[in-house]
Structure formats: structure tokens, C-alpha cells
A protein has these predicted regions:
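C-terminal cap of thioredoxin/glutaredoxin-like
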Residues: 2-47, 85, 98-104, 167-232
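Hydrophobic single-pass membrane-insertion segments
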Residues: 49-59
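A short beta-strand-turn-helix
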Residues: 63-80, 106
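Flexible, active-site-adjacent loop/turn segments at secondary-structure boundaries
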Residues: 65, 71, 120, 149, ...
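Structural alpha/beta surface segment adjacent to cysteine/selenocysteine redox centers
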Residues: 78, 83-167, 227, 232
Length: 232
């Protein structure tokens, strides 16, 4: 596993995906005018409005059920659940993906393993928004096609790039753009992040087999853990 942070970095790990983005922003710009404008925009006679910055469409609040729904492959009734905490900006996640390790495991344990993806966008400042984009693609039933496109053309994670990937895999562009621009799935990404830190995950990819977090897992270690979970 790569992308593991040094002890010094881990001590200052951002508390959330939003904090990771904010850290980068604070280093580049003076936000005093933005704060004043936000305060003014939030004051409405007779009530409070939900603000979605810069004229972007407002996100629809997520249900608790949606927070717990993840992209997955394999039967929900499978005796083993294999969770990957990953990042669409992670070079090691990409290498695992392109080498077909996930698909090899699913083939080896045919019908006995359910693979689940969860977001842990820790690697780049653009990773949290890319994670939201993946969730928007999942809404249209094409998360894994979208993931394929991002990893094939790796490193392109601007908002325009994320929208271009949506077009490449045949998503409804207007629906995807509205979802991404509104921050519709920021809460879902935060939910996954919080779950990862609870384990505690500090690098990607990270793997969990039936609730057991495997530190610094290799493909062989994953296979052994799955076999043990199956009682072999």
C-alpha cells in the first residue's frame, strides 16, 4: 500500500474532506470578502435560507438510507463483504484497479464475496469533489464505468474534467452537472470519511473484510482474510 502519510502528516490530518479543500484555499486567497458576502446573503426577513454559493443549485437533503448505500458488486446475501476505502486521485488505488485485483477476487470467490466501494478522498485537493462526482454517477447506475474512465485518464480532476468523464460514459449531462454543482453528495462523502477515520483508515486503498480492517493489505493478505471469513 502506498500513499501512507508520515507520522508528522498524520498528526495534522484534516478532520474532513471539506477541511482538506479549505486548507488549500486558505493558503491561496483572502476570504474576508467572501465571508462578509455570505453573512449578508444568509440574512432573510422572516427566516433563514439554505445557501448554495455562487448561484449554484441547492442540494436536496439526503436521507439516512442514501448515506448508507454504496456502489457494490456481488450479491447482498454473500457471506463475505469486502469494503475498499479509496480515492479517485490515488495512484495505488488506480494501480490495483487497472491490474484487475478486485475482479480476480470476485471471480475466485464467485458469489461468496460482495465488494463495496466507499470514499476516503485524502490524496489531492480535488479528491473530495471527485468523490462527489462518483456518487452522482452512481445515482445514474454507472459508478464503476465512471471510475474506469477516471482511472484510465488519471490526474484530471477539475470540475470540467469530471463533467467530461460523465459525458464519456453516457450519463445525463444536465442531471450530472446539477448534482455535482450543488454539492448533492458532500454529506455522503463526509459520511464515508467519518466511517473510515473510525477504523482508523489513514491511507488508500484500505480494505475491510467482514468488519475487520486489514492494515497494509496485499492481494495475498486479502485472499487469506476472505478464506478465514469463509471458514476455510
Amino acid at each position: 500500500m502506498s500513499n501512507k502519510r508520515s507520522p508528522k502528516f498524520q498528526e495534522s490530518l484534516p478532520a474532513s474532506p471539506a477541511a482538506a479543500r479549505s486548507l488549500q484555499t486558505r493558503r491561496r486567497s483572502n476570504r474576508s470578502q467572501w465571508i462578509l458576502w455570505l453573512v449578508a446573503a444568509a440574512i432573510v426577513v422572516g427566516g433563514v435560507i439554505i445557501f448554495s454559493g455562487s448561484g449554484q443549485p441547492a442540494a436536496v437533503p439526503l436521507s439516512a438510507d442514501r448515506l448508507s448505500v454504496d456502489p457494490s458488486i456481488g450479491p447482498a446475501s454473500a457471506p463475505v463483504t469486502l469494503i475498499e476505502y479509496g480515492d479517485l486521485g490515488c495512484t495505488t488505488c488506480r494501480r490495483w484497479h487497472l491490474s484487475g485485483i478486485r475482479d480476480q477476487i470476485l471471480k475466485q470467490f464467485d458469489g461468496q464475496v460482495r465488494y463495496v466501494w466507499r470514499d476516503f478522498p485524502i490524496i489531492t485537493p480535488q479528491s473530495p469533489k471527485a468523490a462527489e462526482a462518483g456518487q452522482c454517477a452512481f445515482d445514474q447506475g454507472k459508478f464503476f464505468e465512471y471510475q474506469d474512465a477516471v482511472y484510465r485518464d488519471f490526474g484530471k480532476l477539475s470540475n470540467d474534467d469530471l463533467k467530461n468523464f460523465a459525458a464519456q460514459v453516457g450519463l445525463d449531462a444536465a442531471r450530472f452537472d446539477q448534482c455535482l454543482d450543488s454539492g448533492q453528495y458532500a454529506a455522503k462523502v463526509q459520511h464515508d470519511w467519518d466511517e473510515a477515520k473510525r477504523l482508523p483508515v489513514q491511507a488508500t486503498p484500505a480494505w475491510v473484510v467482514n468488519g475487520q480492517y486489514l492494515y497494509n493489505a496485499s492481494p495475498d493478505k486479502l485472499t487469506v482474510a476472505i478464506q478465514q471469513a469463509l471458514g476455510r
